[in-house]
């Protein structure tokens, strides 16, 4: 775990210096990720029992993360719903884009590309995270990776699909 001095609570919108990098939490809202509903709504005001069961957990405040390394900017959109105003005025070389729940937000990929103008999009949040790391991952219900990749390409952006435990190299000069 992290020591107390390494932890920082944020309400978002403020630049957090992380060495030479800068990080900003952009307030967001959780998408309808499972069966058209927001999973685990609400906040946790006390720690859950240990070990927690799934129904003990809550998602709390949702953020998208803008990360600037000095040379490269990355935005991680971890829910298929977002607040457009929070993304306006920012650009990203790479967007890690949530694959689950996109069918519940019309023009999801188009809106992200229009707002952030990325060169690359990495689909994320597409597997159940329940399979052993050395076995093929299982898709979350409703995720269609080939369709998602086609949608990314149709917006003029290069999709980078990251294999589990794999490495992916790409030309940053394109």
Descriptions of predicted regions:
Residues 2, 107-108, 143:
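Generic recognition of short, well-ordered alpha-helical segments
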Residues 8-15, 114, 120-174:
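Binuclear metal-ion centers of metallo-dependent hydrolases, dominated by the metallo-beta-lactamase
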Residues 53-110, 115, 119, 123-133:
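Metallo-beta-lactamase
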Residues 1-7:
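Helix-loop-beta element that forms the nucleotide-linked donor phosphate-binding surface
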């Amino acid at each position: 775990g992290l020591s107390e001095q390494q932890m920082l609570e944020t309400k978002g919108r403020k630049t957090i210096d992380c060495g030479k990098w800068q990080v900003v939490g952009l307030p967001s809202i959780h998408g309808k990720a499972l069966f058209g509903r927001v999973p685990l709504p609400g906040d946790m005001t006390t720690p859950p029992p240990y070990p927690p069961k799934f129904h003990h957990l809550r998602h709390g405040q949702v953020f998208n993360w803008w990360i600037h390394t000095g040379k490269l900017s990355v935005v991680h959109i971890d829910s298929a719903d977002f607040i457009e105003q929070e993304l306006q005025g920012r650009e990203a070389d790479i967007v890690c884009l949530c694959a689950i729940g996109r069918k519940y937000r019309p023009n999801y990929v188009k809106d992200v590309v229009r707002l952030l103008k990325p060169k690359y999009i990495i689909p994320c949040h597409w597997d159940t995270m329940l399979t052993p790391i050395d076995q093929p991952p299982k898709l979350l219900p409703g995720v269609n990776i080939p369709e998602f990749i086609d949608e990314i390409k149709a917006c003029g952006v290069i999709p980078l699909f990251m294999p589990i435990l794999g490495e992916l190299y790409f030309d940053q000069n394109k």
